[in-house]
Amino acid sequence: MLVLGLTGSIGMGKSTTAKLFAEAGVPVYDADATVHKIYENEAVPAIEAAFPGTTLGGKVDRALLSAKVVHDPAAMKRLEGIVHPMLRAHHQQFLDDAESSGAPVAVVDVPLLFETGGEKRVDAVVVVTTSPEVQRERILARDNMTPEKLDAILARQMPDAEKRKRADFVVDTSNGLDPVRLQIREILEAAAKMPRRRD
């Protein structure tokens, strides 16, 4: 089974692209959805111990946690030290299940793929992109998003131009869904002929 790593900076259309891969019959692992799941289950005790007052009703309160880590690189590292091992276990379970199902290709949707060295764990990388103007417009339309919070998030992410340079495939979401569907079909055709290269 070939594993495609799907990534892209915030607001690029990565989640929509992931849904379109799933629509094409490809198993898709969603790292963000997995984070939400573990914030409601196994990560709660460790996060409350490391960041007191960030859980409510037995779940991690993302807004409270974000306020404690967004401007503190050391706190962010501590949080990643708690969450990343749990994510890796879920990720491996997904791959095992996808392989058992006989899927020829699987997609792992990981926002910080390059930033966390995740490109070594996939066979090819798909980077989702759009223009900086469209990106900013999409992000600032979200609830609880401010220009300052956006700048802090972007500062932690590899620049889009660098991601595109390191990609095997680039999906441009600037022109609507039909062009994205076509790009996905082309990627899946090319992926069928690629050798496996992950660690």
From Swiss-Prot:
GO biological process terms on file = coenzyme A biosynthetic process
Q: Does the keyword Ligase apply?
A: no
Q: Which GO terms describe its cellular component?
A: cytoplasm
Q: Where is the DPCK domain?
A: 3-199
Q: Name one GO molecular function term.
A: dephospho-CoA kinase activity
Amino acids binding ATP: 11-16
Disulphide bridges, residue numbers: none
UniProt entry keywords in alphabetical sequence:
ATP-binding, Coenzyme A biosynthesis, Cytoplasm, Kinase, Nucleotide-binding, Transferase
Note whether ATP-binding occurs among the keywords: yes
| Family of the protein in this entry | Belongs to the CoaE family.
Task: Return the NCBIfam families for the record.
Answer: dephospho-CoA kinase (TIGR00152)
List the protein's name: Dephospho-CoA kinase
